[in-house]
Amino acid sequence: MAHKKGTGSTRNGRDSNSQRLGVKRYGGQVVKAGNILVRQRGSKFHAGNNVGVGKDYTLFALVEGMVTFERKGKSRKKVSVYPLAQEANVAVDQA
C-alpha cells in the first residue's frame, strides 16, 4: 500500500469560457432599436441599412423593424433592418 498521495497532473484542468458568438436575431424577426443581431469576431457579416457596428464588431439594430440577411457582392453578407409600415406596427401592438 502506498503511503503517499498521488500528485495528479498539473498540466491539465483548464478551459476557457465559451464566447457565445453567432446570429442572435434571424431574418424575418421583428426587432427594437438596440437589439443585438450578430455577435462576431471580425466582420463576417457587414452592416446594412439601419444597422450599427460596435467596437467588437457586434451588429445591432438602429431602428425598430424587420431583420433581413442579404448578399453584398459575391462573397459578403450584410444584415439590414427595414422599418415596418405604421399599420403593421399598430397590429403588432394590439396582438
UniProtKB/Swiss-Prot annotation:
Gene3D superfamilies: 2.40.50.100. InterPro entries: Ribosomal_bL27, Ribosomal_bL27_CS. Residues 1-24 are annotated as: Disordered. GO terms for cellular component: cytosolic large ribosomal subunit. Pfam families: Ribosomal_L27 (PF01016). GO terms for biological process: translation. The keyword Oxidoreductase does not apply. Residues 7-20 have a biased composition (Polar residues). One of its GO terms (molecular function) is structural constituent of ribosome. The keyword Ribosomal protein applies. Keywords: Ribonucleoprotein, Ribosomal protein. It comes from the Bacteria. Belongs to the bacterial ribosomal protein bL27 family. HAMAP family: Ribosomal_bL27. This is Large ribosomal subunit protein bL27. The lineage of its organism: Bacteria, Bacillati, Cyanobacteriota, Cyanophyceae, Oscillatoriophycideae. The gene is rpmA.
